[in-house]
């Protein structure tokens, strides 16, 4: 059968890739508006698949800040690089803590909730992410990770909670405990990690 002259074959090489925000302009506008309203210290970057950089607030949770939080966190929230992936919003972005940056050994142990590449473990599986969810929910979880990380470093928490502290206030009293421990002149010491030197 002869080939019709009006048929064209598009090869992968002939296709020009576009960024997710070109394919999803409404989602891009929504993310930018929500982040500007809730996390104004973050700056958008269009490098790669885009993302945000900056410092998260110490306590963006929907309950009162526990006494001693500023002492435990050294007066600053988590500095992050948030890297979207081109499949966003079908897949969540990766959140990389910059300050404080987890130690290499902490990226190999589940109890720190850090992946091997240094990004935060946000979900038990990526299928928990709902593409309709606000991106700000992930930023709140990252800020809360910073609190649990400080509590572990202070030795008042042995491992991070399974579901995080965003919706669970059970560990809030530990913030005051860690602050009082620091105020009493005792140095905050990271819990001994089995099999590590030192």
Residue ranges and their predicted role:
Residues 1-77, 87-198:
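UBC/E2-like fold recognition across ubiquitin and ubiquitin-like conjugation systems
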Residues 80:
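Extended lipid/amphipathic-ligand handling interfaces
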